[in-house]
Amino acid sequence: MKFIYSIFIIIQIIFFINLINGQIVRGPDLQLGYVENGTMLLGSPNVVNIGDQNFMNTKDLSNSSWTDHRYNRYDWSFIRFHIRNNQSGFEATADFHPRVDEFSTIKFSANGLIQYLNETNKNRNVFKNREVEGYTVWAEIPYSKNVTSFTSRLVDVPCQETLTNGSVVVSTDKACQNVTDITTATYQKVENYNSTVLEPIILPPKHIFEFSTRTFVSYFTIIFQLDNGAIVDAVWDGDRDTSICKNCDSCIDNQCATKFDDMRCDEGVGCQLKFFLAWAGVDKSGKNCVSLNKIPSKFQKYSATAIKNMGTGLVSDFFYKINDNNNNPNTA
């Protein structure tokens, strides 16, 4: 009996140690990604302005280094974030190196904006309201994707055709009736065709604030798509599944938003604009990606927390509690 009791105590100790070092208590560690905190402050005058030059515009997409590179799980990749204010003209970038198939979290400080939104005098400055609402975010990944365009055109077709078996077929089209020489007559028909070209992977801009509904997108989720280790696409989760917004206070460009007044932020820390990164598909070694199961829209299925309130900045929010890693290129 004492032996069984001892085994039970040992199992409890092991469970407790794993829990303390696990995601729920300490937050995701290296195996679940790394938070890049404080890289950029929204509205900060000290961030380099890159103008309207997109990163991928400088890359030769025919170069195989941008199209043929393949990743295994835990390899370092690259993504560049852009934040722009369409009213003030402020623009900045931040680079991040997420590890393949890790659920990664990136935070940008938005304290000043959130404090402004929570001012008691809600309409003190119309231009300031528009300036805050003018913030947009987008992202670039230094790889290309195949984009197929479907279109149609009018083509001339002979009214009379000779088939391979020697038989002659005459079209019943109106243009082929009452013609002088059926052998030279033609009619027009619509021909559908498609063409495939390489285009850079650029996620479209999304707004962060909306004053008409007094809502704010507190987090964005990006899904990377792997095909045998090659990054072939990336998409905003809200664009991937538009039903996500049905349980939110509002939808801003298909992204789930919550009301300003409902934002619960850590005292002295404020709210952070967050980007969650996850992976789908198969890596270079043929392993299926599993980090997709950790995104908020998936997690919502097993949580009592409303999806609109996930990641609002609470101390207990395990999305943030990340351990430092000296070998992480994001800290270099």
From Swiss-Prot:
Gene null: resulting phenotype: No effect on growth rate, asexual development, sexual cell fusion, or zygote formation.
UniProtKB keywords: Glycoprotein, Secreted, Signal
GO cellular component, one term: extracellular region
Chief place of localization: secreted
Signal sequence extent: 1-22
Localization per record: Secreted
Glycosylation sites (chain numbering): N37, N63, N86, N118, N146, N165, N178, N194
GO biological process annotation, one example: sexual reproduction
Protein name, per record: Uncharacterized protein DDB_G0273449/DDB_G0273577
Taxonomic source organism: Dictyostelium discoideum (Social amoeba)
